Amino acid sequence: IIARSLNEIAKKMCAKGKGILAADESTGTIAKRFKSINVENIEKNRLNFRQTLFNSSAMKDFIGGVILFDETIRQKTTLGPSIPELISKHGAVPGIKVDKGAKPLAGSSDETVTEGLDGLRERLKEYYELGARFTKWRAVYKISDKFPSAQSIKSNAHALARYAALVQEAKMVPIVEPEVLMDGSHNIDKCYQVTTNVLNECYNELEIHKVDLKGTVLKPNMIIPCLLYTSPSPRDRQ
């Protein structure tokens, strides 16, 4: 029953013609956006901005899910319902980013591993009670002559799988986001090779951790040459 429910949520999030809205800007990030339009960065203004966004007519037609920030999922609208209730009213699924960010990977000079597993089971229980029905966790990989290392690929895949298993245990759908960054000087073939290795390792770990893939959503990077690559091959131009 739980597996069927998770699959239905995942399908609703990714319904044809709809996308997932990333509205999980941190307080610091939204401050920069407000500054550009001379709006004070206070909770009232942040609530009004998001409430206006989630009340728009486009929500029903184009949005299948909304990723929220911790502050936002706890807020109530000026009309009474909570933000998650408002999102659900418009036919979208409320979700929450749960990772704690990419931190330096011990044993590697310039790579990261995403943290946030400590206390995650308890946080997931609270987020479910607040109305979340899916979550997001992002791992990042950089490409260079030395990177990503096997250590980085394995460490991040293991963390993603542990996260996904905990999320499904909490009756929510995990978005699995292993992102190979565009930074560097690599071509499209290198991006393809690294992304393939990263995804293979992620799905190996998901299987080991008994994650039901039908109750997950994959958020992959695009296969493209990096930002600094200057000698495109015929394949790069396609």
Give residue ranges: language-model regions.
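Alpha/beta enzyme core
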Residues: 123-130, 134, 163, 169-170, ...
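Alpha/beta catalytic barrel-like cores
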Residues: 1-130, 143, 231
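Active-site-proximal loop/turn and secondary-structure-junction residues that shape catalytic pockets
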Residues: 25-27, 70-72, 100-102, 139-145, ...
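Conserved, mostly hydrophobic/aromatic
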Residues: 42, 137, 176, 218
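Conserved small/polar residues in nucleotide/adenosyl-binding loops
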Residues: 229-238
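A glycine-rich phosphate/pyrophosphate-binding beta-strand-loop-alpha-helix module
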Residues: 129-149
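Alpha-helix N-cap and loop-to-helix initiation/capping positions
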Residues: 41, 112-119, 148-159, 186-198, ...
